[in-house]
Amino acid sequence: MAKVIKHEIFYPNPVADVWDYLTVPELMKQWLMPNDFQPVKGHEFKFTAKAMPDFDFDGIFHCKVLEIIPYEKLVYSWDFGPGNGVLNKSEVNWTLTEKNNGTQLLLVHRGFSGSEMLPIFGAMDKGWLGNIHKILKLLNPETDATTTA
């Protein structure tokens, strides 16, 4: 059975401010990792991280922008693995909604199937939760947020 990561968080900030943290490479690097992202449908880009041999991960996430609706939705592929041509394929979906003078952000990451994916699923689930809270702290150093998984 496939596992899905799902987190929702409220930011007391305008949608445009949250959107920037999802689409501006320099801001993305502050809460996620170095990248060559461009907010253009079809753009192929990479996130680079420390290799994790225990997870059979070479340190590179190979991505492609699949859908983009400015200030509303961003979807990209998120493929990773040992770098030998065999990649684990997944998809990251961000949805932003204006709510109560702020932004409701929904993150859904799909594509974790098979028992061999359980360790990476757990690591990614925890990682995404921490990362969306990093955005909150970058936007509002003095504020806390609520999240639901």
Q: Which residue stretches match the model-derived regions?
A:
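A conserved amphipathic terminal alpha-helix motif
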Residues: G111-A149
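Conserved catalytic core of Hanks-type protein kinase domains
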Residues: Y21-L22, I68
